[in-house]
Amino acid sequence: MKRLLRIGFDIFITSFTPIITWLLIGLIISKDLTNVFTLTYPLQCLMGIIVSIFGVGANISGIKNKNKNSANNGIVYGTIISIILFGLIALNCKNYINFMNMNTDIYLIFCTYSILQILLQTILHLILTKLYYLELNKKANKISFLFNIINFITLISVAALIKNQLLISIITLVILTLFDIILFVKSIDKIDFKFNLKNCFKYDSVSCSISIMYFIIYLFGFSNSFSFGEKYVVAITFATLITDIQWDMSTAIKTVAKIDIVKNKFDYMEHFKNAIKFTSLLITSVILMGLIVYPIYNPNLLIVCIFVFLHILDFAMTPFNNIKMCYLEIEHSPTKTTINTIIAYIIRTVISLLPTPFCTIIGQICSSTYELIYAKITYKHFKKTI
């Protein structure tokens, strides 16, 4: 349980900053601006795709193919791709906002800021991935914490002093860009521009594929949901803000389980009991955050209750799903487990395209239910055969 709390706290630090930042921006400037968090949420999946290929894939490729420059090459190519991709999205920000069925007059400046901030975060994560594979975790965590703190302090302090959205965005982005440039120069020592894109995708293909599906889910799902009106935009933003940290922290269950499985220290009941306790804490924190934030934004109570209830229901499945899926992936069949994980995400993607404001959360529940059934049946059968 201590390890779950320790790893969960590390995740909490990096996840909490953007949440509290957008909550405070909403309080300082305009309540509507909090919705930028969900407006640009799909674009974070693009960051996941780029980091998967040019970060994780490049580092694994370097180790397997004995190319010392692979990680550096990945950072350089990933940075170039990121600048082009997010730059084009920022230049077409109005079209993006219109596609998401939101008001360009309200969201244009801060949406552009958020897109460029995700660009800078992508470059940061490419560099952090290299440090993780060099086993410089403490250094990586310090850099990540420093970036988030600089972003938070600069954005909030400038917003408190200056109400001009354009100036707030420019000042914050300039400081974060300087941070990234300094970090980039210090992190890149030698490059040879050799890069095997096929291998880099192959070595982290599951994560990359899931990020692609997440992008489709949130891009079309949120666009679909937002088309039903402002009350759904506010409700989805509210539900996302009070559950996003907890979803990130719940990955600690998988992390701890995988460590013990690999080291032959795995005890299912011990992990299950700890996961139940940990998930209970996460659900409690969701309810508390909801009670604290609700009076500030006053979203439609019925709609919010539906979204939050379904999130909590999905949280309740986590201990039953994650531990068994980790065990099956490592000890049973990585291929079969991966295929079924992808099937679950395909189900989620298809349902997210349905014409209902609840499409994304319904897809999420259906995906988890499929994994729950698969994990229970396969785990039970596998344990009988060993």
Each language-model region and where it sits:
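Short membrane-interface helical motifs at transmembrane helix boundaries
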Residues: 26, 83-108, 281-305
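Interfacial/gating helices of multi-pass transporter permease domains
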Residues: 25-48, 104-108, 166, 199-203, ...
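Alpha-helical transmembrane segments of multi-pass membrane transporters/permeases
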Residues: 7-11, 68-73, 130-157, 166, ...
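Hydrophobic faces of transmembrane alpha-helices in multi-pass small-molecule transporters and flippases
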Residues: 1-16, 20, 111-115, 138-145, ...
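Alpha-helical transmembrane segments of multi-pass membrane proteins
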Residues: 102-127, 246, 298-324
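Small-residue-rich hydrophobic transmembrane alpha-helices
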Residues: 22, 36-83, 128-133, 233-285, ...
